[in-house]
Amino acid sequence: MNFKYIVAVSFLIASAYARSVKNDEQSLSQRDVLDEESLREFRGIGGALLSAGKSALKGLAKGLAEHFASGKRTAEDHEVMKRLEAVMRDLDSLDYPEEATERETRGFNQEEIANLFTKKEKRILGPVLGLVGNALGGLIKKIG
């Protein structure tokens, strides 16, 4: 009789443990799904912010380019204009990465292309902000 109780209690403990493991697995998979959904949301928000930032920079660069194109230019203005044109090309290549990588990277393997595109994204942010700051500073100086 004691043996029956021992077997019954062992069976209850084993089934409780199995349910506990199953619940843990389900909660982990639910957590993974929630984590993945939140990552997708963050990526979506980041993509929207990047798109808005690119649009704003393009608009600002076009406005500055029109300003410099309409009047007489000094050598410094000409240099700023050249930089703005380069920035516009880089921003356009971010919008159409397939075309840009085809044009600029013929003969490279896929890893080199990915590295080049990542470097281009990193290379744009610093100089664009500096260039816009310098151009706006120059405009404010001329106006004031």
UniProtKB/Swiss-Prot annotation:
Distribution of this protein across tissues and organs: Expressed by the skin glands.
Domain of life: Eukaryota
Subcellular location: Secreted
Isoleucine amide modifications at: 143
GO cellular component terms attached to this protein's record: extracellular region
Keyword match Nucleotidyltransferase: no
Propeptide residues, chain positions: 19-43, 74-123
Family as reported in the entry's similarity comment: Belongs to the bombinin family.
Protein name: Maximins 10/H3
